[in-house]
Amino acid sequence: MPKAIQISEFGGPEVLRLVDVDVGEPEWGAHLADELERIVALHGDTTIAAVIVEPMAGSTAVLPAPKGYLQRLRAICDKYGILLIFDEVITGFGRLGHAFAAERYGVVPDMITFAKGVTSGSVPMGGVIVKSGIHDAFMHGPEHVVEFFHGYTYSAHPLACAAGLAALDLYRDEDLFARAKKLEPLWFDAAMTLKGVPRVLDIRCVGLTAGIDLASRPDGVGKRGYEAMERGFHDQGIMFRIVGDSIAVTPPLIVSESQIGEIFDKVGKVIKALA
């Protein structure tokens, strides 16, 4: 029986929540990537196929990579011949003001996974972009071997492909990636109006995303976040994601300047009304 694939995790930007840092993309933390060196020393570089990372972790309420963190990962992977994979399911297609976060940060990974934004979320679809060397490794194998087996039941589903092509046309025709980049300073300033509001511990913004950490209640973690979600929906008519006692706000790329102000006005009212 083949040896099971093993996955090792090492400390990344999540550690930043344990220290006192500024909002936005942290200046401190690039050295956290050096933990990969320890993993390599422990297991050996020949046992590590790839490193996978989210350039901005959205499901943990917006954790941006510290400045220099992704560049350091790229350098270490190059040093040991390890593939670097960017999970851009959330960050791809304009969320950070570029087609992909790789472009924003100036780091070229070996593979990019994408989904969500490729169809603007209208139909489930995902895909992988690979460097030519990886592509060629599949395509230049023995003739009797399938180059890259991907003909699964829902692969290249016509509905998803049609939605993806339509979304890409709209992104191009309405220049939505550049629009998101232009709106980012306004989005940041609007989010920062919540700084100093009681129960707000930290605010993180990158692209058109914002994460707001709230102080937990003495009677349990997550209860304040849940109340915020309920109040947002029922009292203010706004929907946002909660992760424990953190709020994640990610508007559509067509959001207007006035709507940005309205969003954070409503979020502020929700937070101020919390028990």
Q: Which role fits each region the language model picked out?
A:
Residues 25-275:
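Conserved N-terminal phosphate-binding loop of PLP-dependent enzymes in the Aspartate aminotransferase
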Residues 1-26, 30:
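Short N-terminal strand-loop motif that marks the start
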